[in-house]
Design a protein with these regions (language model features):
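A structural motif in glycosyltransferase catalytic domains
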Residues: 6-13, 24, 117, 153
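Glycosyltransferase donor-sugar binding loop
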Residues: 1-2, 22-36
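Conserved acidic donor-binding segment of nucleotide-sugar-dependent glycosyltransferases
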Residues: 47, 103-115, 121-127
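A conserved mid-protein helix/loop that constitutes part of the nucleotide-sugar donor-binding site
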Residues: 2-16, 34, 72
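Short acidic/histidine- and often glycine-rich active-site loop of Leloir-type glycosyltransferases
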Residues: 76-79, 90-105, 110
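Acidic donor-binding loop of glycosyltransferase active sites
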Residues: 56-72, 82-83, 90
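Nucleotide-activated donor-binding/catalytic signature segment of Leloir-type glycosyltransferases, i.e.
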Residues: 33-52
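A charged, aromatic-enriched C-terminal amphipathic alpha-helix characteristic of glycosyltransferases
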Residues: 115-116, 126-157
Length: 157
């Protein structure tokens, strides 16, 4: 059974980060979804389709963390000004095309392993998070609007 989203890395991150300082908001459903009820700092909302609720959850989040198989959801997170955190593309950690939108240390963080992840998240300052988020929002505004995507596609033809 495939676990492209690397929920094992998510669970390991939840376990290793300070539970008093870090909370996790989980949105989504699926057969590989772990049981998050074991963790008192994890808030599992399941599948959400109401954009108002999603907007509120993005508003209170500091980072968007998806260990593997990042897809279109990162564009939404970037539009909300959230830095993207994921693991480097490898044989074990597959990534979608949207992975290329993440610029390490500019609009997000790309981790090499779990120790790198824990260290870098733990050392992030609020100012760094704000700057990464502002850069993420700027990238979406400049490059990833539907108009620009159409223009880029047409330029190839």
């Amino acid at each position: 059974e495939n676990n492209y989203r690397r929920t094992d890395l998510l669970i390991e991150t939840i376990k290793q980060l300070n539970t008093e300082k870090y909370g996790f908001i989980i949105i989504g459903a699926g057969k590989n979804k772990p049981d998050f009820s074991l963790y008192n700092n994890v808030y599992d909302f399941g599948a959400i389709y109401d954009t108002n609720i999603k907007r509120e959850l993005f508003y209170i989040a500091d980072l968007y963390f998806q260990p593997g198989w990042v897809g279109l959801s990162i564009v939404e997170a970037m539009a909300y000004g959230k830095p993207i955190c994921t693991f480097i593309r490898s044989e074990e950690t597959k990534q979608c095309v949207e992975y290329s939108y993440i610029e390490n240390n500019t609009n997000g963080l790309i981790f090499t392993n779990i120790d790198d992840c824990i260290t870098r998240i733990s050392q992030l300052t609020n100012d760094e998070i704000k700057q990464l988020g502002a850069n993420a929002k700027k990238k979406v505004a400049q490059l990833l609007t539907p108009q620009n995507m159409v223009a880029n596609a047409l330029s190839i033809l």
